[in-house]
């Protein structure tokens, strides 16, 4: 009787654990608001924004995370360490074969697709400008893009610009800065190096600071009419 009770308890606990998963992270909502992609135990899943059963998108022993949608919701880009470090991959938002886009030895993490869906914009520590006044630092990445169908990587900015989003016409890029190497998970952080929101006009190459305070301002997104920014 005792072995049966132990087995029953174990099965009950396993079923309960599967029905109440924890640590579902890095969620990102589709452009039309109907689907959410998230990371759970190193794989990507997709679920209706109204709830329901989640569909597993990746099945790999590597860690897949930080997914971002393209503008029509047909594809997602994500980071995966399938070859030792985190590279950029792209795949159908319905699952299937993932295509590797980057092959650098340093970690790379996607932020968004370009306005025309042709490029994936990502952050990485690859190459500082030759006239940079400060020695390259591991916490200060640069901004790059790579064709969504594979191709040559291009550097967009030599300064840290994270959580990038573009306006529909591609002329305005919003992002948060990174002034130093503070732990991004630090709670109630206030200091001189907290992140602020910026706007970059890609036509005039002008950067405009939107917020300036000692609290953390992060992850800006445009409102539907692009007249406001949420962060």
For the regions a protein language model found, what residue spans apply to each?
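Positively charged n-region of N-terminal signal peptides that target proteins for export
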Residues: 1-4
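N-terminal signal peptide c-region/cleavage motif recognized by signal peptidases
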Residues: 12-14
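Short N-terminal segments immediately surrounding and downstream of signal-peptide cleavage
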Residues: 19-33
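A flexible loop/linker signature enriched in serine peptidases of the S9 family
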Residues: 19-21, 39-45, 53, 58-65, ...
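Short coil/turn segments that connect the beta-strands within blades of beta-propeller domains
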Residues: 32-34, 72-74, 116-118, 169-171, ...
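Short, conserved catalytic or interaction motifs in soluble domains
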Residues: 49
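NTP/phosphate- and nucleic-acid-binding module
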Residues: 147
